[in-house]
Amino acid sequence: MNIEEFIPIKKEESEINQMSPLVWAYVGDCVYELYIRTYLVDNTSLKPHKLHIESIKYVLRLFHCCQRNHLQAKFLENFYEDLTDDEKDIVRRGRNANNHHLPKNSNVQEYMYSTAFEGLIGYLYLCKKYDRVKEIIEKYIL
């Protein structure tokens, strides 16, 4: 059984494109976390508590890139170079999404860029572009 049989996605790309970028980010957050957790289980022999600690480090790696202006600029510059025009549009829509809820340990700019990244991952996943999801996570996070 492949992923499309395990978790079928029935919506067409045109329908997915009409979704709120916050929906993409909601899915992207989950896909990103599952990818990191699976990677750690497959590549380490850590016990559950240590797995949790390590997975948090990968999430923080993304957030730290988004927190510090110089790191953020470098991350986005490198990240943007590899995106297609359509992907850049998805990132822009995710970054500009109007969310009225801000996590207490986050600032607005940090949250915007994290939402943009998660939005792209979610969008690509929903559009069944699994190879691209893997490529982005492996290149920029692992």
What are these regions (language model features)?
Residues 1-142:
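Double-stranded RNA-binding/processing signature
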